[in-house]
Swiss-Prot record:
Catalyses which reaction(s): 4-amino-5-hydroxymethyl-2-methylpyrimidine + ATP = 4-amino-2-methyl-5-(phosphooxymethyl)pyrimidine + ADP + H(+); 4-amino-2-methyl-5-(phosphooxymethyl)pyrimidine + ATP = 4-amino-2-methyl-5-(diphosphooxymethyl)pyrimidine + ADP
Function: Catalyzes the phosphorylation of hydroxymethylpyrimidine phosphate (HMP-P) to HMP-PP, and of HMP to HMP-P.
Gene3D superfamilies, per database record: 3.40.1190.20
Protein name, UniProt field: Hydroxymethylpyrimidine/phosphomethylpyrimidine kinase
UniProt KW Transcription keyword: no
GO terms under biological process: thiamine biosynthetic process; thiamine diphosphate biosynthetic process
UniProt source species: Staphylococcus aureus (strain Mu50 / ATCC 700699)
Binding site for 4-amino-5-hydroxymethyl-2-methylpyrimidine: Q45
PANTHER family named in the record: HYDROXYMETHYLPYRIMIDINE_PHOSPHOMETHYLPYRIMIDINE KINASE THI20-RELATED, PHOSPHOMETHYLPYRIMIDINE KINASE
Pathway: Cofactor biosynthesis; thiamine diphosphate biosynthesis; 4-amino-2-methyl-5-diphosphomethylpyrimidine from 5-amino-1-(5-phospho-D-ribosyl)imidazole: step 2/3; Cofactor biosynthesis; thiamine diphosphate biosynthesis; 4-amino-2-methyl-5-diphosphomethylpyrimidine from 5-amino-1-(5-phospho-D-ribosyl)imidazole: step 3/3
Keywords: ATP-binding, Kinase, Nucleotide-binding, Thiamine biosynthesis, Transferase
UniProt record similarity statement: Belongs to the ThiD family.
Enzyme class at the top of the EC tree: transferase
Gene expressing this chain: thiD
């Protein structure tokens, strides 16, 4: 029997399953990798917004990570919501010990509802602790603005932001997601690496049900990197995956509903095999 590839997510929770660790694990499963999860924050949230946040003590995060790494090694790691500087330092310790493992950062700073999930000091700390270790960072436009200090209102500013991530912050790769810009009917993302810039375009779907898109997108990239896929191929798969998940949203909840994490499986005709 072939052992499955393992992807580890380190993030907050969502009891309604649309974002955070819950969304990541579903995305890993849909990509055919074994998912593991370490919780950083217990978040009371739903499709209407974030109601309460309880950040776990960094020692509790350390204990979870210790349990994982003392037993097995993931083939790729992603981080999502990390709300305290102490927790960032804890995670950095494990990443430094395992630098060969691909690392994806989804710099979760704002919920879809607009709720802030990270204070200013922690945002600054992110730039010095985790971003320089990342194989790829996946901010949306508001998050890229928070990190770079730019007002990103043009393609020229997107290019400038990408250069800041690569040349100044030190990330190996950065995808600036244009899904938050409503100027066109096309969702265009920009992948920056030391080798240059590549773009990805997909149809933009007119729907409010986009809760957890950033989590899902970065989780699929993580899963594909765990399989050994090159970054470009991983991003290409993630774009297809997220487009289908938005197109076939399950319309759950009374607010901004989640995407469909199993739409890609069904479209590919694999769901019947998995249910046997």
């Amino acid at each position: 029997m072939i052992k499955p590839k393992i992807a580890l997510t380190i993030a907050g929770t969502d009891p309604t399953g649309g974002a955070g660790v819950m969304a990541d694990l579903k995305s890993f499963h849909s990509c055919g990798v074994y998912g593991m999860g370490v919780v950083t924050s217990i978040v009371a949230q739903n499709t209407l917004g974030v109601q309460h946040i309880h950040n776990l003590n960094h020692q509790w995060v350390d204990e979870q990570l210790d349990s994982v790494f003392n037993d097995t090694l993931p083939h790729a790691i992603k981080t999502g919501m990390i709300a305290t500087a102490d927790t960032m330092e804890t995670i950095r310790h494990y990443l430094m010990q395992h630098e060969s493992i691909p690392y994806v950062i989804d710099p979760v700073m704002l919920a879809k509802s607009g709720d802030s999930l990270m204070d200013n000091d922690t945002k600054q700390n992110l730039q010095h602790t985790l971003l320089p270790l990342a194989d790829v960072v996946t901010p949306n436009l508001p998050e890229a603005e928070e990190i770079t200090g730019l007002t990103i209102d043009s393609e020229e500013k997107i290019m400038q932001a990408g250069r800041i991530f690569i040349n100044e912050i030190g990330s190996k790769g950065i995808i600036i997601k244009g899904g938050h810009s409503n100027d066109t009917d096309i969702a265009k993302d920009y992948l920056f690496t030391n080798e240059g810039v590549q773009t990805f375009e997909n149809e933009r779907f007119k729907t409010k049900h986009t809760h957890g898109t950033g989590c899902t997108f970065s989780a699929v990239i993580t899963a594909e990197l765990a399989k050994g896929r090159p970054l470009f191929e991983a991003v290409h798969k993630a774009k297809k995956f997220i487009s289908m998940s938005i197109q076939y949203t399950p319309e759950i909840g009374r607010g901004r509903g989640p995407v469909n994490h199993f739409a890609y499986l069904k479209k590919e005709g694999l769901d019947d095999e998995l249910s046997k």
